[in-house]
């Protein structure tokens, strides 16, 4: 069974790049009728918080990307210890004693000599006695995974195609700190094996991590999953990450963005497929295909999202928004108002225009005289059906007005606004009695 995972660290709120990663993993799993796993990567105990964990769950629920199962790495340390010891017994993990300052000096010297700034494996040359002396001085080791330099690292990426790394050009990665806490790389591999993750989908900034993790999979004698590395999103001139203040779910909610609008855009930018106006995720699931993804950076444009949000609302059925509309606003009212709104908050505004008192418009004497004429005609019409077209036709003939001069004074008098939803529809909501009252108020 195809199984994907979304593995955020609860050290901050999800940003748009995280949301895209979660979405693509969810879509791929659902396309193959597989499983979508949420794994909270909370090994960083100092920065991980329950508040952020709860926010991640809430954000995924808002996006309708509900996982089939959830795990927390903080509850899995026993398994990590077992695998750590097995790799140590195989000689694939070794202790190192350099301080951060010493490592930084080594990097700067290597760069100065025109060499790759990778770890020189000096710790492998320490004797047992030298290690004991260092530890007797109170120096606790951190631990590195020893890369196999004899075999090139290769995989066929679902997006990037054939990938090849020379392990000699990579540093043996630190996998455990001196205080015993875990870094990202090894627990991630252990969990991917244990959770039977078949496909790892993430940003292209993880490509070098994948190279080292492939050797960890092999050292643990596990079958390799497939990998798909997406081009990073860009917003303006910089890649998007939570450390650069990119939009979070809270920001999108504050901007009244519909979840489906965000998902419809994120699923298609950076692919050869057009962004579609959708009201549910089904078409994105059905048509999902990694072969349509580009290696070029994908630009996330907030203006494009807001435009898409409006277009989606214009076709959204009443049933999908009824619980978020003003009380007593029915399906007919929604159909009248929805073609003219950019976000759902505007529905409440137009409902108030229909149901509540409006400000008296500032009109010229000429327009007031025109409205007196309009009111007289309105009182003669049959309001059992919508009289708007008949009303306008008569006014046009009798007044000689046309275009803006014909329509705008009526709109101002009846709604207090210079633009908005179609007046025929609005008039059906305002009704005969209120329409006459507003015309009377406007000409006073």
From Swiss-Prot:
Main location: cytoplasm
The UniProt record lists the keyword Protein biosynthesis: yes
Binding site residues for ATP: 242
MF term (GO), any: tRNA binding
GO cellular component: cytoplasm
Residue ranges annotated as motif 'HIGH' region: 8-18
Reactions performed catalytically: tRNA(Glu) + L-glutamate + ATP = L-glutamyl-tRNA(Glu) + AMP + diphosphate
EC number annotated for this UniProt entry: 6.1.1.17
Signal peptide positions (record): none
Family: Belongs to the class-I aminoacyl-tRNA synthetase family. Glutamate--tRNA ligase type 1 subfamily.
Subunit-structure text: Monomer.
Protein name: Glutamate--tRNA ligase 1
């Amino acid at each position: 069974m195809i199984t994907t995972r979304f593995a955020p660290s609860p050290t901050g709120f999800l940003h748009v790049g995280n949301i895209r990663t979660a979405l693509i993993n969810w879509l791929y799993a659902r396309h193959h009728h597989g499983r979508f796993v949420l794994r909270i990567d909370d090994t960083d105990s100092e920065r991980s918080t329950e508040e952020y964990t709860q926010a991640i769950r809430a954000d995924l629920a808002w996006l309708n990307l509900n996982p089939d199962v959830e795990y927390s790495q903080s509850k899995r340390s026993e398994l990590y210890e077992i695998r750590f010891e097995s790799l140590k017994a195989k000689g694939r993990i070794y202790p190192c004693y350099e301080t951060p300052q010493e490592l930084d000096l080594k990097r700067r010297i290597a760069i100065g000599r025109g060499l790759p700034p990778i770890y020189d494996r000096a710790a492998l040359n320490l004797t047992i006695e030298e290690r004991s002396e260092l530890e007797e001085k109170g120096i606790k080791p951190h631990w590195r995974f020893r890369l196999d330099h004899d075999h090139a690292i290769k995989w066929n990426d679902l997006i990037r195609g054939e990938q090849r790394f020379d392990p000699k050009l990579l540093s043996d990665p630190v996998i455990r700190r001196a205080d015993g806490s875990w870094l990202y790389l090894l627990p991630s591999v252990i969990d991917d094996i244990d959770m039977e993750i078949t496909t790892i989908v993430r940003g292209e900034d993880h490509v070098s991590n994948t190279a080292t993790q492939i050797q960890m999979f092999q050292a643990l004698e596990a079958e390799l999953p497939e990998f798909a590395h997406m081009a990073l999103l860009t917003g303006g001139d910089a890649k998007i990450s939570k450390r650069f203040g990119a939009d979070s779910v809270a920001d999108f909610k504050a901007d009244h963005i519909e979840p489906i609008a965000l998902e419809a855009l994120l699923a298609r930018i950076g692919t050869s497929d057009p962004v579609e106006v959708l009201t549910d995720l089904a078409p994105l699931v059905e048509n999902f295909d990694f072969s349509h993804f580009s290696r070029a950076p994908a630009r996330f444009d907030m203006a494009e999202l807001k435009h898409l949000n409006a277009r989606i609302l214009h076709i959204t059925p009443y049933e999908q928004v009824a619980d978020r509309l003003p009380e007593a606003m029915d399906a007919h009212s929604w159909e009248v108002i929805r073609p003219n709104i950019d976000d759902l908050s505007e529905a409440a505004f137009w409902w108030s225009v229909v149901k509540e008192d409006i400000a008296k418009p500032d009109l010229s004497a000429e327009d007031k005289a025109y409205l007196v004429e309009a009111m007289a005609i309105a009182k003669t019409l049959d309001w059992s059906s919508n009289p708007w077209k008949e009303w306008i036709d008569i006014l046009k003939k009798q007044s000689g007005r046309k275009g803006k001069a014909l329509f705008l004074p009526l709109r101002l008098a009846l709604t207090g606004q210079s633009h908005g939803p179609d007046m025929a529809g609005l008039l059906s909501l305002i009704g005969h009695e209120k329409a006459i009252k507003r015309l009377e108020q406007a000409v006073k």
